[in-house]
A protein has these predicted regions:
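Structured helix-beta-strand junction loops
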Residues: 189-190, 284, 350
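A conserved regulatory-domain signal marking ACT and ACT-like small-molecule sensing domains
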Residues: 299-463
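Short glycine/serine/threonine/alanine-rich loop segments
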Residues: 157, 227-228, 286, 352, ...
Length: 463
């Protein structure tokens, strides 16, 4: 069976475990596998910005006109230090260092040229900065993919690098066209194929998907070659709740679910898979498996299109404490056709997508990511409507593929009430795949722990 497999950055940094637990675990199943690899942990954060904290990286230095050359040199030194750590695995150091030195030198030349173009004023600044961001993003995956192939070759395996970053390719191809062209004539069955998580395309993968680009490459490759299974290897299982909140011993591995549930998780920021990556695989009928790199014997969680649990159960408690409630109250709303359309036109102008929406006769409440709430956005709403309320909050969700049974909503609400947690807003669609509760931000972790204990663990907490 041919598989397409994505390996995340944290796992890539522990490449000895990737070799032992994934790539070379079964000597009879080394070939016929396509790996889409992320950059080593932290590298893309240094190139762009920290994914979670927003701390600026080299991109910000370039965009602001600061000295990015010194930062590039420092990163080159760090990448070579990473190389040295893989020498015991067979990485030929001189070859690996030569590759990254050349690639970083080329990157600096491109950025220098872009700096001159920016100074000329002939091109839109935004277009040049987007191109720079694309080039910076491409470096990390090219580095890790190149090293992976060299290590596999050193161990006597047939390995092929498909560098989709297009650094030395000026063909004006779309992302799909580049993937199709790169795989044309490739015999996947007889070798290991390692693919960069970044793909160059005229539409710009960063512009379209930002930091979710490696999963989008993974998805598009899976749709291109139609494997028996697509697999994502992470440093954790898809579990009933965040182990960092409830404790590793107080979770249940999901095991089986469907793409609808995966969409719900992605919508609230839980990193199962990027929503724009999941949809093409769902439509193509490609089953997706999520596995823990460090527990190779566990089958993980299989996601398919039509799966519905045989027994009614809650599969995941998810959510976020980094959201904001935006409520619009206006008496003119009553009976007015298309009133909410006017609101969403403002949302669209600011590029804002909501996570939850609830309405009554004269109020509409949206929950959005707090980073989307800018003074200009709020001011435009206040100028258009009678009363606008913004409030930092948290949202906790009860999610499952088979929850359409009487009493689930009541039970979840009672669990929150028993924990002294007030529900400020609630939403559930007819499909009953996700129940969303808006609560006060300081109550978030307590809510997750309480719901997980009562609904997923049956009230039995680990000692």
């Amino acid at each position: 069976m041919i598989t397409v497999e994505k390996i995340g950055g944290t796992s890539m940094s522990a490449f000895q475990d990737v070799l032992a637990n994934i790539m070379l675990r079964d000597p009879k199943q080394v070939n016929g596998r396509v790996y889409i690899v992320s950059a080593y942990a932290g590298v893309t954060n240094e190139l762009l910005e920290h994914k979670k904290t927003g701390q600026p990286g080299i991109y910000a230095k370039f965009a602001s006109g600061d000295d990015y050359a010194a930062a590039l040199d420092a990163l080159t030194a760090r990448l070579k230090e990473i190389n040295r750590g893989f020498v015991p695995l067979g990485l030929p150091l001189a070859v690996a260092d030569g590759f990254i030195e050349k690639r970083m030198s080329e990157l600096k030349e491109y950025l220098d040229s872009m700096r001159h173009v920016l100074a000329s004023g002939y091109l839109k600044r935004e277009s040049v900065l987007l191109a720079a961001r694309e080039m910076l993003a491409a470096i990390g995956e090219a580095h890790s993919a190149f090293n992976s192939v060299e290590i596999l070759k050193a161990k006597g395996h047939r390995a092929l690098l498909l560098d989709l970053s297009g650094f030395d390719d000026d063909d004006p191809l779309t992302i799909d066209e580049r993937i199709h062209k790169s795989f044309k004539g490739v015999d996947v069955q007889s070798q290991v194929v390692v693919v960069t998580g970044y793909t160059k395309g005229i539409e710009g993968i960063m512009r379209e998907f930002d930091r979710g680009y490696s999963e989008v490459t993974f998805s598009k490759v899976a749709v291109e070659i139609r494997p028996g299974e697509a697999i994502i290897h992470k440093e954790f299982h898809l579990s009933s709740a965040d182990p960092g909140i409830v404790g590793a011993g107080n979770t249940v591995i999901v095991g089986r679910t469907n793409y609808d549930v995966a969409d719900q998780l992605a919508d609230v920021g839980m990193e199962a898979i990027h929503p724009k990556a999941a949809k093409p695989m769902e439509l193509a009928g490609v089953p997706l498996r999520l596995k823990n790199t460090f527990e190779p014997d566990h089958p993980g969680t299989l996601i398919t299109k039509d799966y519905v649990g045989e027994m009614a159960r809650i599969e995941v408690i998810a959510g976020s404490d980094k959201v904001t409630l935006v409520e619009i109250h206006d008496p003119n709303m009553v009976g007015t056709v298309g009133f909410d359309l006017q609101i969403l036109e403002i949302f669209k102008r600011y590029g804002i997508s909501y996570i939850l929406k609830a309405t009554n006769a004269n109020s509409i409440t949206h929950v959005i990511w707090e980073k989307s709430v800018t003074p200009a956005f709020v001011e435009e709403l206040e100028n258009a409507y009678e009363l606008v309320t913004t409030r930092p909050c948290a949202m906790v969700c009860v999610i499952g593929s088979n929850m359409a049974i009487p009493g689930v909503l009541a039970r979840a609400t009672q669990v929150l009430a028993d924990s002294g947690i007030n529900v400020n807003c609630v939403s559930q669609s007819f499909r009953q795949v996700s129940m969303q509760f808006v609560i006060e931000r300081p109550e978030y972790k307590k809510a997750v722990a309480a719901l997980n204990l009562a609904l997923c663990l049956g009230g039995k907490k680990a000692a």
